[in-house]
Amino acid sequence: MVRLREIPRTAAFAWSPGANPLLVTGTRSGAVDADFSDETKLELWDLKLDSQEQGLELQPIASITAESRFYDIAWGQPNDEHPRGVIAGAMENGSLDLWDAEKLIAGEDALISRTTKHTGPIKALQFNPLRPQVLATAGAKGELFVWDVNDTSAPFRLGTAAAHDIDCLAWNPKVANILATGGAGGFVTVWDLKTKKASLTLNNHRKAVSAIAWDPENSTKLLTASSDDTAPVILLWNLRNSQAPEKTLQGHDQGILSLSWCQQDAGLLLSCGKDNRTLIWNPQTGERYGEFPEATNWTFYTRFNPHNPNLSATASFDGKIAIQTLQNTNPSAAPAAQNNLSDDDFFSKAASQPQAASFSLPRAPAWIERPVGVSFGFGGKLVFFNKVETAAGQKRSSKLQISSFSIDSDIGSATDKFEQAIQSGDIASICEEHIENAKTDEEKAEWQVMQTLSESDGRTKIIERLGFIKDEPVEEAKEAESPMSPEPKQEDSASLKPNGGEAKKHRRVVSMWGDGDDGEDFLSEIAATKGAKTDNPFNLLSVGNTHLEDQITRALILGKFEKAVEICLKEERWSDAFLIANCGSKELVEKVQTAYLQQKRGSPSYLRLISSVVAKNLWDIAYNADLADWKETMVTLCTYADPSEFPDLCEALGDRILESGNRKDASFCYLIGSKLEKVVGLWVDELQETEQAALNEEAGDSTFSVHAKSLQQFIEKVTIFRHVTKFNDSETSLTEGWKLAALYDKYLEYADIAAAHGQLSVAQKYLDLLPTSYPPAETARNRVRLATQKAGAQTAVRQATPAGRTTTTTSSRTAAPVGYQQPSLVPAPANPSSLNPYAPPVPAPVSAAASNPYAPPLAPVSAAASQYGASSSTYAPPQNQGYAPSGYTPPTQSYAPTSVTGYGVPAQNFGQPSPLGGPPKATAPPVQLKRDGVWNDVPMVTKAPPRRNTPSVAPLTSPFPGQPGIASPPPAGPFQQGAPTPPPPPKGSAPPRNVGAPPTGPPRPSSVSSNATNPYAPPPPAAGLQPTYGVPPAPRTASPYNPPPSAAAPPANRYAPAPATQQYTQGPPSGSGIAPPPASGAYTPAPPAASQQYAAAPPPPRAGFSAPPPASRPPGGGPPPAAGAPPQQQAPPPAAPPKPRYPPGDRSNIPEHAKELVDILSRDMQRVASKAPASFAPQVKDTQKRLNILFDHLNNEELIKTETIDQLAQLAGALAGKNYDIASKIQVEISKEKTEECGQWMVGVKRLISMSKATP
């Protein structure tokens, strides 16, 4: 819980009926204020829960003086005449006063009427919840009146005068004419207003009835509470069988004064009483959920807020009305100082103060619990639950169902169809279907291109699709060539002619040797004829030749083709140059071609085309060709481009076309060039346009369906394109800078949609196409991988559920938390009698950390025994048990030395003693326990002073509660006989240490840690969990080891904090391990442990064994030698002369290197002592005491080594510099590494660090 506000009044109160939480208070009759004021007031209070500036204590918003004090007060529902309702007061003088709440807030005269019909004080009153104008009042001498608040002049009376007062009444919330009353006579009367007679009387065994509450859901059930201290119980009655109560709720120590049954959740009940406690219950099951912070005086009135039951208010005679939340599940703060400081002298003198409480409901309240819920599960699953109707008092349960779900069935079918087509490899049919269903020319052209690319000779088909056909004859040139022209030309027979339209004319170089095939045949025949002779002789160097021709002839004669070609090029005799070059090398031909094309630059375009083809440089065409002829350019690229350059050339041409604004033709170029990264950007834009067009059609599809279908078309297009082009993504190993990032995002989106429709394999397929380190896909990959794991690989065994099938599971909300195990050794025994002050204590069981967010928090258990815990009998036969489960046999084991178990229970050993007992095995270290907040965490937590809590009452597991349970040790009180007297300790053993006095009163064991933090107390160690070994839970009783009460003994201090337990208790200082006998039969407590809780003690031993102490050391320091070990047969070394010891408090012999640390610690201790609050004086005094122990060790130069002194000097320096973190770190290191040197003084050092940090 969290205390939100406090009202500093001892008053009766009532909640306002509206949503805004207001409280009205009236000075309580019979109470005396701290200032002994006799002033009586009616006041209104606004909680201001939404104001962060409002402090804990409130101030009234309206206040008027009343003529008499109040026994009870009620606030009725608003109506037309009274918009804020009517406030009714049950006055001590017997009058019924009514006030208008609206006028009271406005500061006007608010009194409506004052009527006196009662002859004595009015003890109780209540408005009828079903008829708000009806009011019932009850009081002294059995007077019971029913009023109409609109006309208070004529009330009618129920019943007749009686000897006993009526102290409480309650209207039935379901039946308007039923009223129940109760009083000091011990009877509960149920009245029927229709007959104006008592219809039923319940016998409460003549125990005074102080409170009545009707079941908010069942009109025949009610609760009654008794104010009798001898029977402080709550009884649940069913009027259908009124002979005996249906259930009894026990938990209060003294009489109960008030009940409040939550109207929104019949499983919640508040009760408060004379034991200063406010408890919360489940009245249907009788389970007690927890306890609110205990007050310092009687709590006489408690109520849930009628509008917001998470709020409740409790009034007590300590002068406060506490407004608090139902519970607090924030992680508990460090336990208060009393849980940390283990010195019994400190605890015996600690100031009495209330304890804090914290609890968590094991289930969510009804106003938070959802009766039905649904959630989409990954993989196309729909998970939903609904509440299963159960009878009152039974555990609430829900029916959980899992079914398949599809947002749009067409999406799933389209995906399946496409995947099947891909697996069949029928790409052509897919393309044909898309071509037929294409809605735009652009989409149709894209699918046609992909269909073409899927064929074997794709580039040839592309040329034909562009309208060109290879090897078609070309028309002869019509132009007349001049006979004198050095370069006669003709049409190139290998040129291309468009299929449709006017044919283009292309020129070609014509040989000077004439046209036709006759010359070629002739020359070939001559070349092939050996020794051919003609009648036409010629001169190599003719007289008619020019000088240039003779030079060419001479060069040819000598085989100098290069020189002959140079002469021809100089004279621009291109035909001769080409002819001669053909006789030479390939390089020579290329040289002539280059010179010719260079000379003819600017001539017809075919020469530039042939220049690019000859030079194998088609980039000039791709970058510079006119875009009006982009088809011819593409055909040229398809005809001449090298396969390695073809994609890039297509990309360059496509980029130019795209820049001109023609997306369709650019897409064509990208498709031809297999440039997926380019075409994807265009398709993404096309996807958005397609979606928008589909939405504008208003076909009735949802936005998601339209998007999913458009994305499906996009994915199919990309998939087919990758298939036909055999695209290989080379960027999957990159970590950033992906060119296909836009495509990856669509793949991821498509995988999510496929997974949402239950197609996990399809989703996995497309996730595998993404780069390995693609951050946006991490979550999707993990989800798909987990969802596709086989059942055998999971930790929990589950049944696989086919798609479309519904799995139903019924689960209980109050199931045991995960990780909890029942004790497996022995069953928990029955609670020992609370009247036996010498019964051995039994700690509460501790379970493992619970996963249930509504489970109650686990109490931190310290594996230790109380310093005042008496040892059990050395050996004794087991007692006769009242109950033993079938098959159980008490264990027998050899004699072991007496020890105290790790859970504070004296060990019990059965069987006859044997000579020696072996050492125990070390137990496992405690498990770290950390609880997080759950369903109703609140952002603001107001710290309260440390308060103690009360453990829950353990269940009865035996039909004979008065007898100890199985494996429980026999009671061994200080006055009992029967156990053999232990022998005295051997000579030479270390004497027992001094034992402090027991606490002044029986401390109440605390089962729940406080959430308040003591600024002067060091933070406690983390709470750990130890195995229970079948140890039973502890009852709520007085300390079992206190001496019997006497007439002169002071009363027990019920508010004193309980002494902290220790983690490790050594055996008695005896070589035999047996404690010495008590003198004259007087009770002697067990010696305290040498190692305190914060001294890094070893783990506790197992139950039934003694912890093996360390080896023997001199008496001034450590523990005694190991119990039960045989003596060492060695010659003792010569004893050194004993070093003189100085008296306590002497500081004159402290070594020089330790004086500075002593000065620093002393100064800081004085500073803390001067500024610490008076309530923490015991802690300060105890810390000073422990530091003096350290100084005495340093003064005597004993126990503490030089290295440890150096570390303490560093700690002191850090403390002087206010570096508390460093000081704490050094302290922890010393505690861990120098355990044998750390005694009681280390607790003082640790505490000083915490106090110094908290003191300004």
UniProtKB/Swiss-Prot annotation:
- List UniProt keywords, sorted A-Z: Cytoplasmic vesicle, Endoplasmic reticulum, ER-Golgi transport, Membrane, Protein transport, Repeat, Transport, WD repeat
Q: List all Low complexity biased stretches.
A: 800-817, 1049-1060, 1067-1096
Write down any Gene Ontology CC term.
Answer: endoplasmic reticulum exit site
Question: Region (Disordered): which ranges?
Answer: 473-507, 789-832, 870-1150
Q: Where in the cell is it found?
A: Cytoplasmic vesicle, COPII-coated vesicle membrane; Endoplasmic reticulum membrane
What protein name is recorded for this chain? Answer: Protein transport protein sec31
Q: Name one GO biological process term.
A: protein transport
Looking up SMART domains in the UniProt record yields:
WD40
State the encoding gene: sec31
Q: Which GO terms describe its molecular function?
A: structural molecule activity
Which PANTHER family does the UniProt record give? SEC31-RELATED PROTEIN (PTHR13923), SECRETORY 31, ISOFORM D (PTHR13923:SF11)
| Ranges of the WD repeats in the UniProt entry | 5-46, 65-109, 117-157, 161-201, 204-247, 251-291, 294-334, 375-403
Relate the assembly described in the record.
The COPII coat is composed of at least 5 proteins: the sec23/24 complex, the sec13/31 complex, and the protein vtr-7/sar1. Sec13 and sec31 make a 2:2 tetramer that forms the edge element of the COPII outer coat. The tetramer self-assembles in multiple copies to form the complete polyhedral cage. Interacts (via WD 8) with nup-20/sec13.
| Residue spans of biased composition, Polar residues class | 877-901
Q: Biased-composition ranges for Pro residues? A: 980-989, 1030-1048, 1097-1143
In the bilayer, the protein is annotated as: Peripheral membrane protein
